[in-house]
């Protein structure tokens, strides 16, 4: 395992176990066996590291959804299944669970992280709706409102 991978795995584990606020860059460095300077060659700060994990979660979810989009199911069934899968994915995500706990404990920074996650999901759904409008599978509408 290379240093970056060690840092990423350690940080992910620590964030999931203790939450965003309680984990320090010092702790990540110590636990992963690298210096803080090494961590800062990979990530600008703790926020950018946490956003990396949010993006990682989003990519996992998108890959799962894309598999269904490429199936022979009717469009409406694909949409319903995708929305359900997104909700289940979010419910079962350790990262989102960690963010939710932080928000309950008054960490406003985590509200921003959750907004990034939610905005990305909404943008993704809107993109898929616009694609289906172009294909003629659904009537023209405001995809953002839909």
Region locations from a protein language model:
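Histidine- and aromatic-rich ligand-binding microenvironments
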Residues: 39, 43-44, 49-69, 142
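Amphipathic alpha-helical segments used for helix-helix packing
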Residues: 88-109
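Amphipathic alpha-helical packing segments from all-alpha helical-bundle domains
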Residues: 108-135
